[in-house]
Amino acid sequence: DRPRPARLSHARFSKNHSGRTHSMKDKAGRKHRPLDVFDFPDHSQLSSFSRLGENEKDEESYETFDPPLHSTAIYADEEEFSKQCGSHLPSTPQEKEAKRSSDTSEIEASENESVKISAKKPRRKLKPISDESESPEESDVRRKVKPTENISTQHEAVSATALPGLSEKPAEAVTPQKTGPQSAESSAEKATLATEHQLETQKNKMLPGKRKKPRSYTTDTSDCAPVWCLKEKKASEIMELDVFLSAFENILLEYEQKIDSRVCKAAINKFHSNLKEELIKMVQEIQMLKTLKRKNAKIISNIEKKRQRLIEVQDELLQVEPELKQLQIKYEELQERKASLRKAAYFLSNLKQLHQDYSDVQEEEPSVKETYDSSSLPALLFKARPLLGAEHHLQNINYQLENLLDQK
């Protein structure tokens, strides 16, 4: 197995991190990169230059990615870190002269090394050379690069004092930030928080008639986000999420006051706002669910009352049904009697009228004999009825007399 260079993978992504235009030193470094004199691995020899062509295929995929844009970028050596720090800090005339001398020394060293290395891709880092195989040319390069090392150490000290919130080892993990507008940004954040709080308080004052205020806030003395308040709520309306949200905000405010990093505060505020929105949404949904359950319980109780009343009415109807049938029968009988009485009254009125007419005729013409025809047959039968009764009575007497004679 061929030994690979002992170098961190993050070093490949640290190039062009600041996004600024490079000087002549960077352009020359892309074609002929100087030797890394600050890194001395155990297994590195001069013969490693011959194996660059073979290792380029294996490591070519790592060079196509963009550098990471976060604070965990690790610089491979102090020279790259000095480039990043130097782009953010104002340089003095002495530092400018030192940079120019270092640029010329690196260009000369790269020209000497280009004779030895014929096939080399742009933006390719060479493997460092150990102390055992150190040539006189390399020692000259090492002596010439010392001014750049001093400059990089000065920039490291300045960056360490300007960013106390970061780690004390800038070569391992350093975030290149601008220290100048930090106070202006913090003041702008304070102003935006104050305006947001004023708008929220104005909204709460404009709606005084509401009994329930799901978003009632109280301001803290420090410049922080509003705090969830439980004093304006009733004891029956307070839920576990309200208590959790109030305690969470108090703890978060105390923790935020202890932190000095602006990035951490921004992340904490973002996390706080997202979590608070979710919790407030959950509280509102739970409150709506409670009101719906209460309304549902009322509707169910009303339905039960109406159902009970319906059962009672059905029982009463079953009890009244026999009486209803009897009343219906009586009603039918009365209707029949009424109809028969109406018919009898009509017949009697007609008969009375007939008798009146007959008496009137007899008074007017008493000598005229009565004549009967088929139309007067009912009147003749009615008049002969007592005669027929007398005949039948006589027949009965005759029959009884015959029986007595036979017995003698």
Curated annotation (Swiss-Prot):
Residues 94-103 have a biased composition (Basic and acidic residues). GO terms for cellular component: cytoplasm; kinetochore; nucleus. Residues 273-350 form a coiled coil. There is a cross-link at residue 178 (Glycyl lysine isopeptide (Lys-Gly) (interchain with G-Cter in SUMO2)). The modification Phosphoserine is found at residues 102, 105, 110, 114, 130, 133, 135, 183, 187, 222. Its main location: cytoplasm. It is found in: Cytoplasm; Nucleus; Chromosome, Centromere, Kinetochore. Residues 1-218 are annotated as: Disordered. Phosphorylated by PLK1 at Thr-72, creating a self-tethering site that specifically interacts with the polo-box domain of PLK1. Residues 176-186 have a biased composition (Polar residues). It comes from the Eukaryota. Residues 1-33, 118-127 have a biased composition (Basic residues). Keywords: Centromere, Chromosome, Coiled coil, Cytoplasm, Isopeptide bond, Kinetochore, Nucleus, Phosphoprotein, Repressor, Transcription, Transcription regulation, Ubl conjugation. The modification Phosphothreonine is found at residues 72, 92, 104, 192. The keyword RNA-binding does not apply. A motif (Nuclear localization signal) lies at residues 293-310. Belongs to the CENP-U/AME1 family. Component of the CENPA-NAC complex, at least composed of CENPA, CENPC, CENPH, CENPM, CENPN, CENPT and CENPU. The CENPA-NAC complex interacts with the CENPA-CAD complex, composed of CENPI, CENPK, CENPL, CENPO, CENPP, CENPQ, CENPR and CENPS. Interacts with MLF1. Component of the CENPA-NAC (nucleosome-associated) complex, a complex that plays a central role in assembly of kinetochore proteins, mitotic progression and chromosome segregation. The CENPA-NAC complex recruits the CENPA-CAD (nucleosome distal) complex and may be involved in incorporation of newly synthesized CENPA into centromeres. Plays an important role in the correct PLK1 localization to the mitotic kinetochores. A scaffold protein responsible for the initial recruitment and maintenance of the kinetochore PLK1 population until its degradation. Involved in transcriptional repression. This is Centromere protein U. It comes from Bos taurus.
